[in-house]
């Protein structure tokens, strides 16, 4: 699991059927690395979240058939990132 911040929802003109219909969000780490995750919990831009990766990400998304390796597992109520 990893703690990341939601940057924005990705808008897709079309997508593979096996990606399902969950929103996709662009997330970033405290170091600026960008990730894309499925969002079954309804995050907003700026939220800090924890993510579930690898094969467990499909379970967390609610369907083992979905093509994902990263899913938002929950919104963190109070997270203070490290000061740079």
From Swiss-Prot:
Domain of life, per lineage: Bacteria
Domain BMV span(s) in chain numbering: 1-77
Pfam families: EutN_CcmL
GO BP annotations listed: carbon fixation
GO CC aspect terms: carboxysome
Subcellular location: Carboxysome
Keyword tags: Bacterial microcompartment, Carbon dioxide fixation, Carboxysome
Protein family according to the UniProt entry: Belongs to the CcmL/EutN family. CsoS4 subfamily.
Subunit structure: Homopentamer.
Reported function: Probably forms vertices in the carboxysome, a polyhedral inclusion where RuBisCO (ribulose bisphosphate carboxylase, cbbL-cbbS) is sequestered. Has been modeled to induce curvature upon insertion into an otherwise flat hexagonal layer of major carboxysome subunits.
Domain notes from UniProt: The tight homopentamer forms a pore with an opening of about 3.5 Angstroms in diameter which is positively charged.
Protein name as catalogued: Carboxysome shell vertex protein CsoS4B
Source species taxonomy: Bacteria, Pseudomonadati, Pseudomonadota, Gammaproteobacteria, Thiotrichales
């Amino acid at each position: 699991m990893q703690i990341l911040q939601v940057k924005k929802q990705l808008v897709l003109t079309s997508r593979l059927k096996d990606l399902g219909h969950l929103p996709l969000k662009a997330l970033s780490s405290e170091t600026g690395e960008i990730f894309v995750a499925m969002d079954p919990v309804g995050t907003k831009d700026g939220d800090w979240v924890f993510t579930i990766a690898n094969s467990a990400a499909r379970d967390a998304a609610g369907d083992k058939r979905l093509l994902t390796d990263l899913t938002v597992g929950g919104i963190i109520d109070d997270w203070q990132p490290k000061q740079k």
